[in-house]
From Swiss-Prot:
Residues 23-57, 167-198 are annotated as: Disordered. Belongs to the SEC2 family. Guanine nucleotide exchange factor (GEF) which may activate RAB3A, a GTPase that regulates synaptic vesicle exocytosis. Promotes the exchange of GDP to GTP, converting inactive GDP-bound Rab proteins into their active GTP-bound form. May also activate RAB8A and RAB8B. One of its GO terms (molecular function) is identical protein binding. The modification Phosphoserine is found at residues 169, 180. This is Guanine nucleotide exchange factor for Rab-3A. It comes from Rattus norvegicus (Rat). InterPro entries: RAB3IL/RAB3IP/Sec2 (IPR040351), Sec2_N (IPR009449).
Length: 377
């Protein structure tokens, strides 16, 4: 800015010598320069506009403009700073929110992965357990079918045995057809005698054999048959029912009534519980506890050659018995075996054939009690 005093030789007015006009405001561009006459006109316009103002008013206006522009600039700067701070704060909050959401998403993804893994593991576990149960069920089914086949075979064999009415240990005296031809006994026939007195119609039986008639007359006892039918309607092994009570009183009790009463009671209990075992002496090779010698019957106390011995339940003790005692025990066992078959529903016959089989077994007990028994080979 140029503020030097104008020269006097240019003919400028004296009042303009104290005014300093900025070069910028007068348009000092090269193309707009004017003659001193233009300056006079400009100064005149300043005088008309300012009147009698103080010569220092123009610099004050410039300073005011400068201060106001600085204030505006400072306020704008503060406003921008505030807006920037707000924007930064909002951005920080958004960043924190984004970070939190990222953590939540990562946690959810981890939980989802763990849940998927646990579900697959549980599914595999359930499938494995199901396969194991299926395998066990199939194994049990095979075992059950095997047991069923075995039981069916046993039932078929028992039915065949019962239908033929032959007990497990038949009394050969009551079944002469089981004896060998040489021991079957005499047959009915005629023989010439040197004596002319008469003809003997029947050959006399050999000693030790019972004559077996070809035909026997049979008649049903109504009282016994009524008791049997009442028992057959509801089979039981309770010896207090009328049917079994009579058999116990008339056949089982006397047949198992031996001289040694204490051992007789034990034998009777073992027969009723189906826990008595009869063993041949020759087939035993292992040493066991012997309760008597082989030349004395443990039940009768008589000196007899004993080819069998009995064992009561799970006891290790054995008792040698004579052939007569064995026949009596066997007869009672045959009766109880048939009665158990009826109770288990294995006998499919009418009432009368079953009744006569019971009577035949009772007859075997009576004969054994009376001392009749088959001779051993």
């Amino acid at each position: 800015m140029w503020s030097g005093p104008p020269q006097q030789d240019e003919g400028l007015p004296v009042g303009l010598s104290a005014i300093s006009v900025p070069w910028k405001n007068l348009g000092p561009s090269k193309g707009n320069r004017k003659s001193p006459g233009g300056l006079v006109e400009a100064s005149a316009s300043w005088e008309e506009a300012g009147g009698e103002e103080h010569p220092a008013a123009a610099p004050l206006d410039v300073s005011r403009l400068r201060s106001s522009s600085m204030e505006i600039r400072e306020k704008g700067s503060e406003f921008l700073k505030e807006e920037l701070y707000k924007a930064q704060k909002e951005l920080k909050l958004k960043d924190e929110e984004c970070e939190r959401l990222c953590k939540v998403r990562a946690q959810l993804e981890q939980e989802l992965e763990e849940l998927t893994a646990s579900l697959f593991e549980e599914a595999h576990k359930m499938v494995r357990e199901a396969n194991m149960k299926q395998a066990a069920s199939e194994k049990q089914l095979k075992e059950a079918w095997g047991k069923i086949d075995m039981l069916q075979a046993e039932v078929t064999a028992l039915k065949t045995l019962v239908i033929t009415s032959t007990p497990a240990s038949p009394n050969r005296e009551l079944h002469p057809q089981l004896l060998s031809p040489t021991k079957a006994g005499p047959r009915k026939g005629h023989s010439r005698q040197k004596s002319t007195s008469s003809l003997c119609p029947v050959v006399c039986p050999t000693a030790g054999h019972i004559p077996t008639p070809d035909k026997e007359g049979k008649e049903v006892d109504t009282t016994l048959f009524a008791e049997f039918q009442a028992w057959r309607a509801s089979p039981t092994l309770d010896k207090n029912c009328p049917f079994l009570e009579r058999v116990y009183r008339e056949d089982v009790g006397p047949c198992l009534d031996f001289t040694v009463q204490e051992l007789s009671a034990l034998v009777r209990t073992a027969v009723e519980d189906n826990t008595l075992t009869i063993e041949p002496v020759a087939s035993q090779t292992l040493p066991n506890v012997e309760c008597n010698n082989t030349n004395t019957c443990a039940l009768s106390g008589l000196a007899r050659t004993c080819h069998h011995r009995i064992r009561l339940g799970d006891s290790d003790g054995h008792y040698y018995i004579s052939p007569s005692s064995r026949a009596r025990i066997t007869a009672v066992c045959n009766f109880f075996t048939y009665v158990r078959y009826i109770q288990q529903g294995l006998v499919r016959q009418d009432a009368e054939p079953m009744f006569w089989e019971i009577m035949r077994l009772r007859k075997g007990m009576s004969l054994a009690k009376l001392g009749f028994f088959p001779q051993e080979a």
